């Protein structure tokens, strides 16, 4: 399974992308 830091970084990227729309 992915590490917690990887999941957190991916989630942050998704939130930033959505917020930028």
From Swiss-Prot:
Keywords: Allergen
Keyword rRNA-binding in annotation: no
Top-level lineage group: Eukaryota
UniProt name for this protein: Pollen allergen Ole e 7
Organism: Olea europaea
């Amino acid at each position: 399974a992915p590490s917690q830091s990887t999941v957190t970084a991916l989630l942050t990227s998704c939130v930033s992308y959505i917020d930028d729309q």
